[in-house]
């Protein structure tokens, strides 16, 4: 489904280039739920943007369904994103001049053969699924951060994506709404077979995944199978990375005590 082959990405700093992603290799299978964890600045969000074709690597290849993203034109990438990819941005990226329901509908408006009525009916159902149907005529500036996040999540589902990338999807939500969102993501993954890749600081979210990738200083330092937990109770913790020990060896020692 998705393959990284020796992928490297750097950005120009004031005095020198900053290596953000360093020779990363990994593969994600169709229908897999993968969580990417690591401290701030470790390259997680950059990795996610590369995987979605929002940016191109300096070196290496990224293959989606066997197709190299670097070899596609901007138009081809746009068509790929509108037909196969969903993305939940950490900063929402809602269009300020469109209402909530119009923001949700946008991807289908530019790429679907559905009628306008069908598109808005589908958009309305998605708003209902994230408990935002009462805000459909509101503009982004009239919404709280958590409400904007839920609108962005509804938008990411509109094209029934084959693969969904989510950058901190629960970061701006309380525990109740975080649980709702993660249940929706899990349903997309398990019931519809969509591949799900989530960047998160919250180990409660990460442990829902089939597999956890850990990044540090731009490098993929560990890949391990998650000991999956059930969705409930959803215990949202902003300090989960700092307070949790991610080393499998140390975790096994703690169990033996």
Predicted regions and their residues:
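ABC family nucleotide-binding domain
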Residues: 2-215
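ABC ATPase nucleotide-binding domains
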Residues: 227-257
């Amino acid at each position: 489904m998705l393959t990284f082959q020796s992928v490297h990405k750097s950005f120009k700093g004031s005095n020198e280039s900053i290596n953000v992603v360093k020779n990363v290799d990994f593969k994600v299978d169709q229908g897999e739920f993968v969580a990417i964890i690591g401290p701030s600045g470790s390259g997680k969000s950059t990795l996610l943007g590369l995987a979605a074709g929002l940016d191109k690597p300096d070196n290496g290849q990224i293959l989606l369904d066997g197709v190299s993203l670097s070899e596609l034109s901007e138009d081809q990438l746009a068509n790929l994103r509108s037909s196969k990819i969903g993305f939940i941005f950490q900063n929402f990226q809602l269009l300020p001049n469109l209402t909530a329901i119009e923001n949700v509908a946008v991807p289908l408006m530019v790429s679907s053969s559905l009628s306008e009525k069908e598109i808005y009916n589908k958009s309305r159902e998605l708003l209902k699924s994230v408990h935002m149907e009462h805000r459909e005529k509101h503009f982004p500036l009239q919404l709280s951060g958590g409400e904007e996040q839920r609108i962005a999540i509804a938008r990411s589902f509109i094209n029934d994506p084959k693969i969904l990338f989510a950058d901190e999807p629960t970061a701006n939500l309380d525990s109740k709404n975080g649980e709702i969102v993660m249940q929706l993501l899990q349903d997309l993954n398990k019931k519809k077979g969509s591949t799900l890749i989530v960047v998160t600081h919250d180990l409660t979210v990460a442990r829902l995944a089939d597999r956890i990738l850990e990044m540090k200083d731009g490098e993929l330092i560990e890949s391990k199978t998650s000991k999956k937990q059930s969705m409930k109770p959803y215990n949202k913790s902003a300090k989960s990375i700092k307070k949790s020990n991610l080393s499998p060896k140390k975790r096994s020692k703690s169990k033996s005590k």
